[in-house]
Every structure is written in C-alpha cells, then in structure tokens.
Amino acid sequence: MNEFIGWFNQVLTISIQLYFQQECEYSSLEEVKPPVNGWLEKVTGVPDLTFDERMVVMLALMPHVCPQILDIFFVQNKNFDRQYTEFGGWKGLSHGGFLPTGETASFILAGEDTEKRKGVIRFFQKDHWFYTKNILRLEGAGEGEPFLSGQLRVSEEFLSRVLLDKEYKPD
C-alpha cells in the first residue's frame, strides 16, 4: 500500500502543478506509472484497473490511510478569500482533515477538461464496478446540488480488506 500512497501523492502534486501552470517535469498525469506490485488489484478484486480508476480508489482511501496528503486542498484562493471551488471536498464532524468529493476526483483527473469530467462522472454510476463490487460511491449530495458534490466514500467491506487484510463481518 505504501508504494501506492507515494504514487498517489506524486500524481496529486503533478496535477496541481499542471492546473496552476507551475514548472513540472511531466506534461500529463499518465506519465507517472503506478506501482505494479498487484496490491490494488488484490484488494479490489479487479485485474485491469485504469490509471483513473486507481487514482479514484486511492483518493477515497486517503482520509483513512494518509489524511495529511490531502491538506494541499486547504490552500486559499487569494482572489476570493476562500478555498478553491474546483477542489470540492468537505469537512467532517470530528475529522479535521479534508474529505474528498467527486469534484475532488474530477479536479485531479480532468482539471478544466469537460470531456474528461464526463468520464469521471461515469465512475460513479451504478453500473460501474466501484458500485457493483461495493468498493466506493458518492453519497450525500444535497437536493439540487451538482452530482459530483457528493462525498467520496469507501465501503466498510473494502476498508476491512485494505486496513485489516480480512473480509468485513458486520456485528
């Protein structure tokens, strides 16, 4: 898992550099190859994950395994004296860190590209394996609010496999 956390952190940093047109040694996120140790395939049960699917799964796991990586999203937009809308995210009742939304995933993977954004939206449809295999989903978007404003949440079953290396057994 640590290799994937490092990879996620690198891709997140590059995503921000590219979005804000900062100096960056990469011209696209896909140039950063994910680890090939098979860990993510094992815990998801999916053999051929795409780059974007790997990123979404790791984004959803970050609050549970390495929440400080997401602190970058607390940066303020000095033009409006508020956080960047495009980062999405929310703050929990007891967790002081950044909790990602679908908007966060869209920012990392699509930036301002509306066609890529459509691809991110497809990840959260009920026919995608994120949902059918009970890995993760978007929850809690308020009535009339944008679809991607929903909270990016991993299932208890998936968390059990990731954090405890065992199948979830409800009480």
Please provide the spans of the model-predicted regions:
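Intrinsically disordered, low-complexity N-terminal extensions of AAA+/P-loop NTPases
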Residues: M1-D171
